[in-house]
Amino acid sequence: MYYFVPAWYGTDRIWQQTATPWYWMRESIEFDDTINQVRIFQEAGMDRTLLLPQYSPQLRYFLHHQDLLETDVLSVFDEIQGVPSDLAMRPVQLQDIEWPSETTFSYTPFLVMAFRKGKCLAKIDTGVDGNILTLTRYKEDEILYVEYLDDRGFISSRVYYKDEKPYFQEYLHFDGQWILRELLTDQSRSVLVNEAFYYAFKKESYADMGEVVSEKMKEHLLTLVLGRDQLVLAAHPANLAFLQDTASSVKKVLSFYGDRQPLSAENFALYFDMIDAQLLITDSEKTKEAIGVFSPSLAQKTHRITSFDSRLRLGSSQERKESKIYFYVNESELPSKSQLKKVLEILAQYPLFEVVFSFYNGSPERVKELEQQLEELIASEQDLHLVQSPSQSEGLGENQIIDEEYEQDAPNYRFVVKNFSSENDIIQELEKTRLIVDLSEEPNLYTQIAGISAGIPQVNRVQTEYVDHLKNGYVLSKGDKELEKAITHFLLELKPWNEALVYSIEKIQEYTGQRLIEKWEGWMKERHG
């Protein structure tokens, strides 16, 4: 059995993975190495289990989005809360919740408000699928508490407020009793155990939630069987302690992804953790080299596995006469004016080219800023008016003019600025995409994974693990002045685009499915003779 411990942690509170209301989401691409690995083992029918340390009441929706619902889950908090292991998903509707008589509901584009006799009773927040995440209960316009719903149809916890700030959180047993009470003040994050549940814990109180999680995780890890089970840990500061809680005779894999686990030669604890693992997996040559700096012996057991998103399929862009360019925009470094002007000049020159400027949960202010920059460039450069769709000027007689008011209100350009809120939206957009452009100092990791997974060539300013120059992409070694050459290389001729597609397919086959599992198991045998 392969036990995978992911790093799906919260930012403010590490042991919390609570879903965010859709209108709050910011830069929340969820895909990572654990998702990639578990999908591969799932598709191959290998025995695997997700071992989860974190509190995650909306876990099933997350697993559904990542195509992982077929994988078994062992959850520390499910055990603590007495949730039956066979309990299925059950979406909660407004009518399932008890409301006082005469309660009315007001629906806004963002959430639902419950009122009674003109006073606010509750605010109901939903996720991207419309599933209810939380109920915020009010009294005299002040928050009493916030209830977190589990996606299996029950109230999982409550956060109580004092002086308009979170005071403590109660984690509820499946039958409704509170089990743990976690203080949320600046002075203390201690955890109290309900006297009725002392039997289930080793202590009556804990310094923090990490101590509770450590106790319960250790109980699970000590049940792993020598010679049968493998523990695959996502490298993350919160996960490293679990290596030491696992019997030394159990095979362990430590998986590095992006910059999730800082690598420093002075981090001796990490060094000993890496010694304890039989296999080290990385997603990049850069990380592999950084591990080698610690010790040559570590380099010998370090292997790179490129991650792919198997939800992406080879797209249908070749079925369109237009060529869509997917231009990733990092909101922390918007494209320069010269870069934008160059893109618009290319659009003006090639009538069948289209561009989608793509933010990932970007702030509305930054999205608007980019839109304004594009509008200003078009207004200031006469030739850039050619970026309008042909349909807007075709069919006009010599003496006809386009209605200026209409033109001002609804310009029909061959570019659009989009702000994507989920990976599924990105995947859908890429189905018709012919080329990806990312001019960031460090290209977006998920965009690169998605591009190669869909067989789409990519244009970048720097060399990366996912893009090889003139094979499945173009690296602008001479700067932005090569941008037109790079774009036309793949969009004006079919041969380079087809070669990039074939190259991507070969890379995918090398690091997915049965071939990857054989490599993985072969590396383990090398370490154990």
Language model feature labels by segment:
Residues 218-226, 261-279:
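Membrane-proximal helix-turn-helix segments that form the acceptor-binding/catalytic region
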Residues 394-397, 411-422:
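Active-site donor-binding acidic/aromatic loop of nucleotide-activated sugar
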